[in-house]
Amino acid sequence: MVQGTTSDAGKSTLVAGLCRVLYRRGVRVAPFKPQNMALNSAVTSDGGEIGRAQAVQAQACGLLPHTDMNPVLLKPNTDTGCQVIIHGKVLANLEAMAYHAYKPKAREAVLASWQRLREQYECIIVEGAGSPAEINLRQNDIANMGFAEAADCPVILIADIDRGGVFAHIVGTLALLSESERKRIIGFVINRFRGDIALLQSGLDWLQQETGIPVLGVLPYLRNLHLEAEDAVAKDTPDKPQTWLRVIAPVLPHVSNHTDMDALRMHPHVDFQFIELNEPVPPADLIILPGSKNVRGDLAVLASHGWRDKISRHLRYGGKLMGICGGFQMLGRKIHDPHGLEGDAGSSDGFGWLDMETTLTKEKHLKEVEGKLTFADAVVTGYEIHMGVSSGPALERPLLHIGTQAEGALSEDGQIAGTYLHGLFDHAEATQAWLNWAGYSQLKQAQETIAHYDYLALREASLERLADEVELHLDWNRLQSYL
């Protein structure tokens, strides 16, 4: 089991790397995260949803994602509550105290999934959540040491040296663990190191002498590693000598599946930027309104920061606008939440750029789809994760067809598009069509390079590169005895 001294210490990345190393060695390996709090999710082979990080880890193992890999998924929709998903299906929206009371049952779900995976695979690499030293969350813990003790897992503790204070993080974490929990830790991994390793060695020697626990390895700071973030919006972009199209998206308070933008963020000729709500909106070819776990709430925040006027000005100057999932719902005239699924029950005015209304329903739509665009000869594959049903004249001009079923909407002038599909930019052919729609096709030289850009192949190459680094920098002789 990989646990971290903090959130974003590198747990997801290390698990993916370990999984790919073992997969390359012929081991039947699977990832597992007992409890995940994240707004980025993926549709599974058994028709549920799990955190996207576990879907990437499944790919590292050569597997399709399955709900047993992440039996408890928490998707925050307010500051004090979240949608609770058990074995891929929505249980309920629960406030924090109500979920705390539910934890014993959640633990049963976690252990049931764990047992099924144990029966199918030779090795399971488990990912913890946050930090194991959260004193207020120790009771009924199912995410970190509580699970490790129940499943009798050895633990690797990973810490991020790039943010500073790595030795304090490690020693402080150990000080807050019980004796039995400390004994589970078989070694430390220092993550995101840049510089001369010789200058770090005295600290590593002190750490091992002080704690009696070995340092299993020091992983370098890996730039341009194209793996989807578990939750935090990734704002760093690779160096791009020449870009021909600018795309922006606002950072919504409850943004979900912002990993839709990763392919654009990494595209060599697209200048993609996430824009904070209070920042000036730069001139752009395309504005994308991303998904949201609280559509009405995020819509109100967008309006309060003047984004209606900002987007209207963008449209007046000929820019394109796209809404994905919750962002699609915002483009309509009204959004109704009669059951209070995402906050207080009621209705809100949308931006009104598409003539449609959306009603949030208790049933969640989860499926992988393949369709054909209506404005280009291109096949689109993606997945749906939403709880809304939209209706209105705008849907009579669909954005794509999934078999005989119409999906999404495209305005009469072709300037505004909306869809429930996530993963729109992951495939080269579809990406070319979307970017041509946004203005890319007007640049002849762009046609020579865009078809060769394949985000899925880039992710696979990143997993291989990550595995190479993990294999090179970790003490596999010591690790092998625990696998």
From Swiss-Prot:
Keywords: Cobalamin biosynthesis, Glutamine amidotransferase. The active site is at C325 (nucleophile), H422. One of its GO terms (biological process) is cobalamin biosynthetic process. The keyword Cell wall biogenesis/degradation does not apply. Residues 244-430 form the GATase cobBQ-type domain. GO terms for molecular function: ABC-type vitamin B12 transporter activity; catalytic activity. InterPro entries: Class_I_gatase-like, CobQ/CobB/MinD/ParA_Nub-bd_dom, CobQ_GATase1, CobQ_N, CobQ_synth, GATase_3, P-loop_NTPase. Pfam families: CbiA, GATase_3. It comes from the Bacteria. Pathway: Cofactor biosynthesis; adenosylcobalamin biosynthesis. Belongs to the CobB/CobQ family. CobQ subfamily. Catalyzes amidations at positions B, D, E, and G on adenosylcobyrinic A,C-diamide. NH(2) groups are provided by glutamine, and one molecule of ATP is hydrogenolyzed for each amidation. This is Cobyric acid synthase. It comes from Methylobacillus flagellatus (strain ATCC 51484 / DSM 6875 / VKM B-1610 / KT).
